[in-house]
Design a protein with these regions (language model features):
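C-terminal structural segment of proteins
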Residues: 1-240
């Protein structure tokens, strides 16, 4: 179906067909969806990126899927469709229901993913046993939404399902507000970035497996979250 391989921008939202390959996200949507484009660059090999899709990641619902953290951080909405009952939309945070399970009904398919075009910097980090063609030991995405003074997060491969870290989001956004940093765009204090990382790690529910221990996953998440928040904030300051 040709429409599944198309994308469009309308009123500040990107409608990404479920069959758009990662390679096109990298080439065409790096400005509108920077976090997802970063994640797409880490997927498999060039051959896999030419064929693999966000729709495929959503359908398999693996907690280690690279697309999930940036979808969560950006506030994506999944558009699904049934021939008998029509279309409906599911927020990404409600889409993952268990290990490799999702909210799709038996007669539904994934039609598209709707994401707001980035209003601020986004970052994606991933730890694996090597630098390429690797399943994530843990992954993290961060999105700054300066237009509404909010922070988005996404955690991968460190819980039964991909998940956000709502307490960490509220903490960082609130501290930035209290310190006047949303307005001043001053330097992000290292202590604040570290406290954010600790809250992200606390939101995870990792296990020990052949790829890494639960303790390592928590530690790596705290480090990635601290770094991602700092990188994103520095990007925001440069754009001011």
């Amino acid at each position: 179906m040709a429409e599944l391989r198309e994308w469009a921008v309308d009123d500040g939202w990107v409608r990404l067909g479920a069959g758009v390959p990662y390679s096109r996200i990298i080439d065409d949507l790096g400005d509108s969806l920077p976090g997802l484009a970063m994640a797409a660059r880490t997927v498999g090999s060039p051959q896999i990126r030419i064929r693999g899709t966000v729709g495929g990641n959503l359908g398999s619902a693996s907690p280690a899927g690279d697309a999930h953290p940036p979808l969560l951080a950006a506030g994506a909405v999944i558009e699904v469709e049934s021939a008998a009952r029509g279309a409906r939309r599911i927020p990404a945070a409600e889409f993952y229901t268990g290990v490799k399970r999702n909210a799709l009904a038996a007669d539904e398919l994934i039609a598209a993913v709707l994401l707001p075009a980035a209003a601020g910097p986004q970052q994606f980090c991933k730890v694996g046993t090597r630098n390429a063609m690797v399943i994530a030991v843990s992954a993290f995405a961060c999105a700054l939404h300066p237009d509404r003074r909010a922070v988005g997060t996404g955690i991968g491969s460190a819980a039964p399902t991909p998940r956000r870290a709502p307490e960490a989001e509220e903490f960082l956004a609130g501290e930035l507000e209290s310190a006047g940093l949303w307005d001043s765009r001053g330097e992000l204090p290292d202590a604040l970035a570290r406290a954010f990382g600790e809250r992200v790690a606390a939101a995870a529910s990792p296990i020990d497996d052949v790829r890494g221990s639960a303790a390592y996953r928590r530690h790596s998440l705290s480090v990635m979250a601290r770094r991602a928040a700092t990188w994103a904030w520095n990007d925001l300051r440069k754009a001011a």
